[in-house]
């Protein structure tokens, strides 16, 4: 399972929001490139960037910072936040971004998503941010009547490479992921689901392993890494490649000699 550290960008700095509230932001580091290097050094296999200014304004804003991060590390980088047109996505892919994440546009303009999947195969994922099972849009400022499971099915049919599912009520709260919602979503589609929001401990990460066989292939961790509640290196060791669970027991020795 991929353990994916999140870096939320606001005005060029690494911050965390509480439940998506821009008024409740906490600056963790003035230099996001430094943070990206740290996560790569600790074993991350992918990095998740959110352009918070972009999510609010409807187009990428932190392009210089995103480019600097992509150049500084060798692992794939995925970016979301305000990606609502083809030009914005092409810009990021040209910078070397591995995967772009659309959200609002999936609800408001599904035909554009289909066009994007054809133009940029394997580069388009959809972020489904849900409140009580319904999809939130426009930087979480609005809640639609669209069910998360229905949107996921529609997007899978259009050819997106993955669904990144965030439970807004859990995000930044350290209350643990919503495993029931993740299970329901993964059972409805055949493409990978990446869990996001609420991870507070190593046991939360381990708890998601039970969902791996049905398609939950990764977990995005944000606040818990910055508060120190989760060690990235430990989490990667626990559920990533060569994890504890994959090491066969040593059956060759016996206490009875």
UniProtKB/Swiss-Prot annotation:
Major location category of this protein: cytoplasm
Alphabetized UniProt keyword annotations: Amino-acid biosynthesis, Cytoplasm, Histidine biosynthesis, Isomerase
One record GO biological process: L-tryptophan biosynthetic process
CDD domains: HisA
Matches recorded under InterPro entries: Aldolase_TIM (IPR013785), His_biosynth (IPR006062), HisA_bact_arch (IPR006063), Isoase_HisA-like (IPR044524), Isoase_HisA-like_bact (IPR023016), RibuloseP-bd_barrel (IPR011060)
Pathway assigned to this chain's UniProt record: Amino-acid biosynthesis; L-histidine biosynthesis; L-histidine from 5-phospho-alpha-D-ribose 1-diphosphate: step 4/9
Catalytic activity entry: 1-(5-phospho-beta-D-ribosyl)-5-[(5-phospho-beta-D-ribosylamino)methylideneamino]imidazole-4-carboxamide = 5-[(5-phospho-1-deoxy-D-ribulos-1-ylimino)methylamino]-1-(5-phospho-beta-D-ribosyl)imidazole-4-carboxamide
EC number assigned by the record: 5.3.1.16
Pfam families: His_biosynth (PF00977)
Signal sequence bounds: none
Subcellular location: Cytoplasm
GO cellular component: cytoplasm
Residue stretches in coiled coil: none
Positions annotated as active site in the UniProt record: 8, 129
Molecular-function annotations in GO: 1-(5-phosphoribosyl)-5-[(5-phosphoribosylamino)methylideneamino]imidazole-4-carboxamide isomerase activity
Family: Belongs to the HisA/HisF family.
PANTHER family: 1-(5-PHOSPHORIBOSYL)-5-[(5-PHOSPHORIBOSYLAMINO)METHYLIDENEAMINO] IMIDAZOLE-4-CARBOXAMIDE ISOMERASE
HAMAP family: HisA
Protein name: 1-(5-phosphoribosyl)-5-[(5-phosphoribosylamino)methylideneamino] imidazole-4-carboxamide isomerase
Organism: Crocosphaera subtropica (strain ATCC 51142 / BH68) (Cyanothece sp. (strain ATCC 51142))
Taxonomic lineage: Bacteria, Bacillati, Cyanobacteriota, Cyanophyceae, Oscillatoriophycideae
Gene: hisA
